[in-house]
Amino acid sequence: MRILVTGATGFVGRTLCAVLAESGYQVRAAVRVDSRLADHMSERVVVGDIGPGTSWDAALRDVDGVVHLAARAHVLNDAPDNTRLYFETNQHGTEALARAAARAGVRRFLFLSSVKVNGEDSMTGAYGAADEPHPQDAYGKSKWLAEQAVRAVAGQSGMQAVIVRPPLVYGPGVRANFLRLMRWVDARRPLPLAAIDNRRSLVSVWTLCDLLATLLEHPAAPGTWMVSDGEDLSTPDLIRRIGRAMGRPVRLVAAPLGLLGVLGGILGKKAEVARLCGSLVVDSAPTRTKLGWSPPLSVDEAMHRTVAWYLSEGRPRDS
């Protein structure tokens, strides 16, 4: 089978292309600009920026399945002027690709959405695939509209639609709070986060890509799926796991949560602090039971792999 992967050179795309190639698929990598690709990306097609006017004809020729990863990524505190770009890329660009794929006779279309379609916190219980969506920002709203567009195209054409909503994805190349936590642990800084009593679902890039590969041919795949490593961690637990994988002592001290919120506001990091303190849990049990699938790695195994990348490539240059 020939599979078109958009966002093939991105954080998730690099790992997915390798997983698919190792599984015997012919991988066609859709890239924004011409660049040197890894050996397992046997075919490449340059599509430019993704939007409603992107031409997909060459990319979709003789393709059996599509995995659409490319998106305008969520950016904390993004400028208001950039809001339209989320909808142009994530909503309208996805719809245009789905319509082109249906015209080209693609059998199955996998769309990587986001748990942000469900909401920003799960204080009342774990998010499930059937829950009513409550996206809060432009990124989440654009992903929700894209999901609806993909389902509509599938309903009109017979193409099978598969949607996956991951929580925070970590692995080689991870950024934002996860990278920041690794750097703090590496620097042996005391962290005032011991009083945080939350739960957050995570998924390693290897587990996510294993699920995506499974969904390409599984007969029960059409539908919407939540995914996680299967073990939800508090922020202090996550820091301890990072420290264990890094071989570093972890220094956690308790600070009032209200004080953390005030400091976050003063430093312009309110959203980052909210994520460190808040809970966001997904119910991935139906994914495991209905598909007969399980994560290929434990949290600790994935953490060790991620830390190994950080120690070799992710550290600040002056470390």
Residue ranges of predicted features:
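NAD(P)H-binding glycine-rich loop region in Rossmannoid oxidoreductase-like domains
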Residues: V47-Q91, A100-R103, E120
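Conserved C-terminal active-site "lid" loop/helix of NAD(P)H-dependent oxidoreductases
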Residues: V205, D237-R240, L263-P295, R305
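Conserved Rossmann-fold NAD(P)-dependent oxidoreductase catalytic core, especially the SDR/UDP-sugar
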Residues: E95-A138
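Mid/C-terminal beta-alpha module of Rossmann-like enzyme folds, strongest
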Residues: L215-K270, D300, H304-V307, R315-D318
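Substrate-positioning beta->alpha
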Residues: V174-R180, A194-L216, P222-G223
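Glycine-rich Rossmann NAD(P)(H)-binding loop
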Residues: G171, L193-R199, W225-L233, G243-G247, ...
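N-terminal Rossmann NAD(P)H-binding glycine-rich loop of SDR-like oxidoreductase domains
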Residues: I3-S23
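Catalytic helix-loop patch of NAD(P)-dependent Rossmann-fold dehydrogenases
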Residues: D81, E88, H92, S122-V169, ...
